[in-house]
Amino acid sequence: MSVFTGWRAALRIARHDAMRSKGRSALVVAMIAVPVLGVTALDVTYRSVTPTTAEQLTASMGSADALFSDEDIGPILQLPDAERYEQVDENAPVDEDGPSIDVTTTFPKGSRAISIQSVPAGITTGYGIATTEIYEFRTSDPLARGKIDLVRGAFPHGKDQVAATEPFLKSTGLHIGSTTTVRNFGKKYTITGVVEQPDQLNVEALYADPGAVIAPWQARADHDKKVLPPNVGSKEWLVKGPEGVGVTWPDVMAANKSGVLVKSRQVVLDPPPESEIPLARKGVEAYPDSSGELSAALVTVVAMAILEIVLLAGPAFAVGARRSRRQLGLLGTCGGDRRHVRAVVLGGGLVLGGAGAAAGVGVGLAATAVFRPVIEEWAGNRFVSISLNPMELLIIAVIGLITGLLAAFAPAIVASRQSVLESLTGRRGVRRSSRVLPVLGACVLAIGCAVAVYGGTDGNSTLVAAGSVTAELGLLACIPVIVGFLGRLGSRLPLSPRLALRDAARNRGRTAPAVAAVMAAVAGSVAIATYMSSAMAEAEYNYVPVLNEDTVVISAFDDKAAARLPQARAAVERNMAVTGGHADFRHAWAGSDCNVYGDAENECGSVELVKPAGEAASCPLTGKGAKELAARLTADEHKKLMRSPACLVGIMSSGVFNAGEHGIVVADEAILSTYVKLDDPAAAKALAAGTPVLLNPVFAKNGEVTIKAVHAYSDKDKQGQKLHPGKARTTTDRLKVYVAPEKYAATPGINMILPRKTAERIGLRTQVSGSVYAVAHPPTGAEEQRTYGAIEQSGGGIWTQSESGPGGIDNSMLLILTLFAGMVTLGAAAITTGLAKADAEADLNTLSAVGAPPGVRRKLSGFQCVVVALTGVVLGTLAGLVPAVALRMVDLRQALQMMRMEPTESAYTPIVLPWTTLGLLVVGVPLLAGLLATALTRSRLALARRAG
């Protein structure tokens, strides 16, 4: 019999066995198909979400041939992709006040064009007032298709209609048919339709026809000086070139001579030779395309996913081989040898692996198509089409098929080693565990950890992936010994858990693969969850807040607006989740107030909080020798320096309380509890007595601070000039201060709180400027719009600020990972419970024969499930930490490189464990698995066929 004939028979037997045991076969197919499905969906989604060059051009210029824009720097040279350009004469001065170029004169003859120009504006909403961007862009023109598309309703036509994006409508409470007023000049517009930018679905904006907003606004501002003119953006043009010609490279270079930058579709898709590109001849190169680069995290995840498929399907094939041992024994009686037995089991892997791979690819494609709208909303851009790469899909299917074979390999070896007599009688015989395997596994585990860590320090993604997989394989080899050790722990436990532990130890051949399956699923999830938690912690640390958390600040533009602060406070208290009273603050200045008179042509006063001389008051990361110091620092040492009071001066936000860069805020003790969160009676007593409270101790020397004031007066400040004629004078005052604990140096916007009477005593002028509130949560969009609307109704001139946090940090992915790992853990535990039930039928019969109650069967199944799930989860957690730590070391290496080039860049790269995820996995999942196994196990004994 030839090799092919033998394999044909083996595949036929495997197919018949799969059809006979449909439940087990479906489980194996699902085990293989689910990861293949995920990888397929990920591949198709990535290809569909990542736009091609042609799709990017359509998103930026619609169906036009080119995008023209005036750069206002004179004649330029550009690369074909328009991403890089330079002045022809780099030394030529830029005439900012010169006449603007008529861009339309640079279009090719016979072209047609439409313009795009934007302006920020305050508009009325369903809740109050909001600020948004209004684009003057003829969205109904065919040239706009692909850049702006209609979702529902109609495009605007005429001077009193606008279209809106869906996010704008959701945030403002408006809808098609609603009217909105541009507050800046009082004109009403009707919303006629919903449009979207296919490449930016989250944009909040309004779209009007050219001339509908900017021109009437400017006309109103020209006639009414109380109306501020529109702050318009630069104008761009979508140009359709002559039919059949388009916009060519000579057209681009001709426009460059007038200072116009051109992105031409045909030039980008078919660039001219380098010899015809003047800027390229100067040595300027295009930005590199990094789309083909694979990150260390991606390589590691793919490698662990392949291993996970193998380990997940392995227990199911072990179930099949054990349940089919009588059939395999009959194969031996008919003259088959070990080679044929292995072929039958491997044939099962080939049959079920092929079915799982095909099902995974097919369902993955279908799932991507069905959930396309959800994926598009999540990604923030539309698919131009579902993009399929046949070669990649074929590789994914082949990997699924091969992993099915690999998963069946170990069960095939075990099945081929059983004697025919053992297979026919159902007896398992006695086989001692290998003493070499655990030692080898421990060595492999150590080597894998070392390789992964070295790869992390070296930034080598291949070594990180290889080391992580090697470490997991080493831990896998140690599982039989670990399971055997668990059997010794049950001597003092009640009957059911004691039997479960001993049964797991005695039957390591079926327990170990199930534990490995759980370990694989949990390891991947823990690795990703740990990496994500660490990245989130890093983002939170690096974020520089504008205000303290859960606070709202209202500030007046000038003294006239300050008179309306009581109405503004009432609006805040009525519309926001205020938790207490407010603290008022005042603006302090010397000479002429720079907020009123400060511009390029007029002089104004200044106030400065002077740092003491010496190294202690200077940040070593900003002065001379900073790079040399950074080269010697570790990440922890750099973090400590960056959070020192001296370095925080240059990091924390300023100007929030109309205080300028000096950070001196005139206020009373109420601001300590409302904003600073400093619960210190001594500090409050000091302010009440007229002693300033210093939050950043770097400005203090011997308990005193120095305030330098320049009393300069603007020519426009007639009253100041009259009272203080002559040259500007400079005063210096030393004040005793109460120094707060060092941690308060990180208070956003404030370096020192100065009592009003002390400020006036040293010659500073003060004016009530605003108030600060503590709130229960950051204001929602609706709350902000209601507050803004109420403030504008009272006369305006007051703005609100709140702290929104770092943003972009979403814990939903951690929840998804936890659910995935939990589901796989439950599945693997269910497999091993079913296998244990089949193997332990004789033991259960013996228990019943000696008088054990029926409930023992249920409890035994439950505890068997708990043993497998808990052991696998704990080992998987340990295995998952290896790649997570290694990947964070890759990030640390990159952060240190950046820090040594820019010493003030953060190198903080924490490793943070996702304790909630780990808690659910370690406690919740094994407990749930045990309860389900207990509930689903029958108490009654089934009649069994006599062995032999």
Where are these regions (language model features)?
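Membrane transport/envelope proteins' first extracytoplasmic loop
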Residues: S2-A313, V319-R322, R339, V344, ...
